[in-house]
Amino acid sequence: MHTRTAPRVRPPSRAAKLAGLLYSLLSYLFFLMTLLYLIGFVGNVGVPKTIDSGPGASWPLALLVDVLLITLFAVQHSVMARKSFKQWWRPVVPAPIERATYVLASSVVLVVMFWLWQPIDLRVWQVESRLGSAVLTTLFWLGWGLILVATFLISHFELFGVKQALDALRPAKPVDGSFRTPLLYKIVRHPMYMGFLMAFWATPEMTVGHLVFALTSTIYILIGTQLEEKDLVEIFGEKYRNYQKNVGMLLPSLRRNPGSQD
């Protein structure tokens, strides 16, 4: 009687690991360019096409297209982050470049949104006061700054897929999987999402097109945060439940219970 043994899987060669690192770095650079364009796109500054510029369709068609574009990003961003999807594509996408591929896919969808976005140039509000305009513009830039700082407080290069590819090339230090709340995370549970909300809503001149973008993005952030927190409770259990009780989700909470995280 003959039995078949499963073929031995060869570990990736150093050349393959270097290729993975190069891929991850290129994905990261593409993400940075996309993020910079997103800032200009939302802020109507420094890029050829913004949220309020360019030719647009009739407003019902423009509204439909814009909502579909945000929905496309929301579906891609959420589905690819699910554990079940990661298990499904793991045989195809090696673990060291899994996160970089996710980041690349998200960047590509954003580029599609920039390209196909339909402006709806009807004013919802326009702040005439210099002081009011300056305050809103400052909040806009503070929002992007908050996002950047928040990424480095956790692990910037791991979040965007570079660290995983680098760790495949060299012995990685043991990962501290304990629950931590560094700096901003002691004030609000999701400072990155808070930053996005600030950046999307703080504008001296709100058009209907910008409002559609801000409103649909806010709905997605609220839904996505709930999904993310479900995963975090599954990972950290009671520690994260206590964190939820003591710290606001997207806005700082005035209430602080004795059992809060250090």
Curated annotation (Swiss-Prot):
Signal peptide: none annotated. Keywords: Membrane, Methyltransferase, S-adenosyl-L-methionine, Transferase, Transmembrane, Transmembrane helix. InterPro entries: MddA, NnrU_dom, Nurim-like. Pfam families: NnrU (PF07298). It is found in: Membrane. GO terms for biological process: methylation. Coiled coil: none annotated. It is an enzyme of class 2 (transferase). The keyword Transferase applies. Disruption phenotype: Cells lacking this gene are unable to produce dimethylsulphide (DMS). Catalyzes the methylation of methanethiol (MeSH) to yield dimethylsulphide (DMS). Belongs to the nurim family. This is Methanethiol S-methyltransferase. It comes from Pseudomonas deceptionensis. The gene is mddA.
